[in-house]
Structure formats: C-alpha cells, structure tokens
C-alpha cells in the first residue's frame, strides 16, 4: 500500500509551507495585531478546496502547516463548520494568545471532523516543537560539544520524533476516514485527537527542557506553541475521556472512567 501524499497534495503542502513561513515567521511581532489574511486564503483557494476537486484530507494538510506556523485565523472553525459566537455580556479570558477563544452554542458537540482537524493541527505544533529542539541541540554548545551529543538531550528528541510520526499517521488516517465517510471515522478521529494533542503537549515540554533557561521565558516563541498544544488538548474531550470512548467502541460495553 502507498501511504505517500500524491503530487497535488505534496504541492499543496509545499505551497502552504512557503506562504505561511513568509506571512508568519517565528520572529514576527507576537504582541501586535495578528492579521489572519483571510482574503489571501480565498485567493489561494483554501477556503473552498472542493472547487479544485479536493477534500478534507487536503484541508487537514493545510491545518497541519497552520499548526506549524501558529496561524492565528479561524481556519479550523471554517473547515469544521463551527460557528464563532460571542458570549453575551461577558469577557472571555484567553490562554492561547495566538488564538482568541469564543463560546460554542449550547448543545454543540465534537464531531469526527472537528477531532480529526484538531489532530492535524496538533501534528504541526508538535513538529515545530521538535524542529526547534533539534536546531537548538545542534547549535548550543556545552563543554565544547553540541548539547545534542548528550543522551539526556538526544533521547528526548528521538522520543519526540517517534511520537510525531505516530501522531501524523493517526491524523492522516482520521482525515481519510472522515473524507470517505468511513465507518471507522469516529474511532479514528478519537484516537487521532487523543494521541496527537497529547503528543503536541509533550513535544513542547521536551523542547522547552532541551532549550534550558531560554525555553522557560517569554522571549522565546516556544511558550506560544505550548499554549496552542494545551488548547488543542483541552478543547472538548480530553485524551483520557477519548480513551474511554475508544474502549467503549472496541469492547461494546460501557467502560468506567
């Protein structure tokens, strides 16, 4: 079986990487206004991929790259059919400063599509945390050698790499199941969100440790990726709850949480 992206998907992924890197570099003014450049997304065709005979798998690829760049716009809400609404007469305190939060209408529930989308974005966040950790481990010198030569550092990066690749496989599987309306869509999406969002949080925590002191400060962008990862993990059903859902589906009985 061929699990590689096809030519169109690879071109779309590369286009997203290039566009996002130019619009949302790591050294951007994080504290200033965050322009979602929605009109540019429309020009790129990302707001209506169906017009190009593409589907949710391609949207998931875009979300992965948006997670990597910490894109500030509501693309996830757009592709999952979620509606942003303001709470009446209240203030919503945000944790992830790169993404304002909104209240969901009463009765809103996570769909497999939403879970798969969040998993895809989490993969991008985890990959960026890993890449930042690798870059620092290669260039930061300690006792005359790059810190990446020490097992305490290199093994953390190796573990993160394994987690990211597993998360990506689950996210792509979930995206395909949702796109094809496969009977395993609910199970795949639950598994993907549980593993990928947790992997993103752990990837950020490990990368912060690899960076040492600077990783714990607001001077470095890592804390923003960490907050996005925590947001993805904590929105809706958490990994522990998703595991109960998965066990229920596998065993056909209600599992005690």
Positions of the model-derived regions?
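Alpha-helical interface subdomain recognition
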Residues: 1-69, 115-257
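Glycine-rich, Trp-frequent "lid" loop and neighboring beta-strands that shape
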Residues: 52, 61, 68-109
